[in-house]
C-alpha cells in the first residue's frame, strides 16, 4: 500500500483541504471515498484503508472543513463557516470524489460516510445522484423533526450569546452526554466511541481528535439533517442494490 497526501481548494474559497489517497500494490478494481465523523480526521481510517487495499481497493478521503489539517489560518477548529457552510462541506466531498475518479478513470467509485460524515454523505447522494456506484452509511441516525427544530433554535440562541465560532457547554452536553451514560461505569468520557479501549485511548492521545464542536458546526449539521430527512429528498438517494454491489465485490 502506498499513501499519498495533498491539498485541494475548499468550496469556502480560503481553506486548503488536506486529502489522502491509499493505493494498493496491485491494480485497483474499485475506489472507496471516505467521509469521516465529527472531531476526528481522515488518517484515523488508515487501518481500514490498509485492509481494503489488500483486497484491491483504492481508498480516498480528506479532512472536512475545520477538522484535522483542513483549518484555515485564523479559523477555529471544528467550525465549517458561516450560515450555509454545510453546503461547502458537501461540495468538498463532491470535489474529492471527482479527484478520485480522475485518478482512477473507469473504476466504480463508492462512498462511505460515518456519523457526521454519513449526514454529509446523505446530503451528497441527494445533491449529486448517480455520481457514485453505491454508498455505505455507518453510525447514521434519524431525528424527529421536532427535535431537529428545537436543536436549531437552541443553537441559534447560543450563537447570539457567544458567537457561532465558539462552543457551548450546554449544546455539547445535550448532544453527547447521553451516549456515555449507556456505558457506565465510565473509564473515560469517550467510552461510547468504541468497544476497543485501545481505540479510545488512541483517540484521546491524538491532538487532531476530540474537542467540543463549535455552535456554528452544530447549526450547520442540524441544517443538513433537516434537509436529508425530508421525504422528497429521501426518494432521491441511490437504491439499496447499488450498495450491495460493494459488499459482493469484497
Where do the model's predicted regions map?
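Conserved serine/cysteine hydrolase catalytic core
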Residues: 216-250
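N-terminal cap/lid segment of alpha/beta-hydrolase-fold proteins
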Residues: 1-26
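Active-site glycine-rich loops that stabilize anionic/oxyanionic intermediates
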Residues: 32, 36-40, 115
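Conserved alpha/beta-hydrolase
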Residues: 47-75
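Alpha/beta-hydrolase fold nucleophile elbow
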Residues: 103-115
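Glycine-rich nucleophile elbow surrounding the catalytic serine of serine-hydrolase chemistry
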Residues: 113-123
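Alpha/beta-hydrolase-fold enzymes
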Residues: 121-208
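Alpha/beta-hydrolase active-site loop
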Residues: 81-102
Amino acid at each position: 500500500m502506498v499513501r499519498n497526501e495533498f491539498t485541494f481548494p475548499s468550496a469556502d474559497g480560503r481553506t486548503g483541504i488536506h486529502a489522502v489517497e491509499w493505493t494498493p500494490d496491485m491494480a485497483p478494481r474499485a475506489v472507496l471515498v471516505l467521509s469521516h465523523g465529527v472531531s476526528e480526521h481522515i488518517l484515523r481510517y488508515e487501518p481500514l484503508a490498509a485492509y481494503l487495499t489488500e483486497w484491491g481497493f483504492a481508498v480516498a478521503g480528506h479532512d472536512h472543513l475545520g477538522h484535522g489539517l483542513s483549518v484555515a489560518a485564523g479559523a477555529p477548529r471544528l467550525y465549517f463557516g458561516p450560515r450555509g457552510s454545510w453546503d461547502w462541506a458537501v461540495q468538498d466531498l463532491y470535489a474529492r470524489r471527482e479527484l478520485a475518479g480522475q485518478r482512477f478513470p473507469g473504476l466504480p467509485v463508492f462512498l462511505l460516510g460515518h456519523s457526521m460524515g454519513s449526514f454529509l454523505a446523505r446530503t451528497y447522494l441527494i445533491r449529486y445522484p448517480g455520481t457514485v456506484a453505491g454508498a455505505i452509511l455507518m453510525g447514521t441516525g434519524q431525528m424527529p423533526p421536532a427535535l431537529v427544530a428545537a436543536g436549531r433554535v437552541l443553537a441559534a440562541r447560543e450563537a447570539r450569546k457567544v458567537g457561532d465560532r465558539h462552543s457551548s457547554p450546554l449544546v455539547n452536553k445535550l448532544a453527547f452526554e447521553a451516549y456515555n451514560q449507556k456505558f457506565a461505569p465510565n473509564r473515560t468520557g469517550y467510552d461510547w466511541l468504541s468497544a476497543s479501549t485501545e481505540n479510545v485511548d488512541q483517540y484521546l492521545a491524538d491532538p487532531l481528535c476530540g474537542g467540543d464542536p463549535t455552535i456554528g458546526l452544530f447549526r450547520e449539521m442540524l441544517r443538513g439533517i433537516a434537509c436529508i430527512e425530508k421525504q422528497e429528498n429521501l426518494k432521491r438517494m441511490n437504491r439499496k442494490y447499488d450498495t450491495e454491489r460493494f459488499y459482493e465485490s469484497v
